[in-house]
Amino acid sequence: MSINVTENHSKTFLIITLIFLLSLSVTGFGKSPEDKGYEIAARSDRSDNGYGDSKVEMTMILRNAAGDETTRSISFTTLERENEEVGDKSLVLFNTPQDIKGTALLSHAQILKPDNQWLYLPALKRVKRISSSNKSGPFVGSEFAFEDFTATELKKFSYKFLREEPCGELTCDVLERIPLYEKSGYSKQVSWIDQSIFQLRKLEFYDRRGQLLKVLEASDYREYLDGIWRSHRFAMKNVQTKKQTDLVWEDYQFKTGLTDNAFEKGKLSRIR
């Protein structure tokens, strides 16, 4: 009986090729959308590691549906926690206008537990703890919610890669992320992360009914500390009310020596 060696080799090659292609469906280029989404989000999150602490002055510009503007000046400080299982700390302090001068929001970000947030109201001379059920509400009349002013910790969300597409002159990875922490005001968020410096360019917020609520656009990125990038303008548009809030940052200062002592609840009433 004759044996067709060439035919057998062809069949063997075909089988090996099929096995290789099947392996790609679960590893390498064939990563699941969830694994790929988490990998991209982690790369973006970790690209900013190592800044230590930061101080920056910023301007908040509120626009109503008619286009009328109100401006507020704010000091914003943050303290980085190197352990990904421990959230960062931040402090927002209003300097103007006079009627809200001294108002301060202290945030201790958590991972899956509700963030710890306290609001100091100088007119009442008291510190108010923000309950987890109120964190989806607007922060001092802006289009940013209380939960938007805490650190976006990597493990607060589950992720799914959706697609790759142009975003301006760049190319972005588009990810869906779903809050894993309790009582979020959002059912999901969709983020655009650029492939050049791995920074957020756009973020869509969907309300609890699954309807698009707000769109955040981040621009004017500048580099600090050899690889630490910061946006100098956020534009948050509420597509349901047509209102908008912009945040405009001045130059950042990093590694200024801040410690946990600067982010204690008991010191809120003495902050100036």
Name these PLM-found stretches:
Residues 151-157, 164:
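Surface-exposed beta-loop interaction hotspot
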Residues 32-123:
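N-terminal mature ectodomain segment of secretory-pathway/periplasmic proteins
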Residues 42, 106-108, 116-120, 126-130, ...:
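Gly/Pro-enriched, hydrophobic low-complexity segments
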Residues 75-82, 160-166, 219-222:
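Short amphipathic beta-strand and strand-loop transition segments with alternating hydrophobic
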Residues 28-30:
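Boundary at the C-terminal end of the N-terminal hydrophobic targeting segment
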Residues 2-16:
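Bacterial N-terminal signal peptides that target proteins for export
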Residues 271-272:
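Short, solvent-exposed mixed-charge patches
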Residues 15-25:
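Bacterial N-terminal signal peptides
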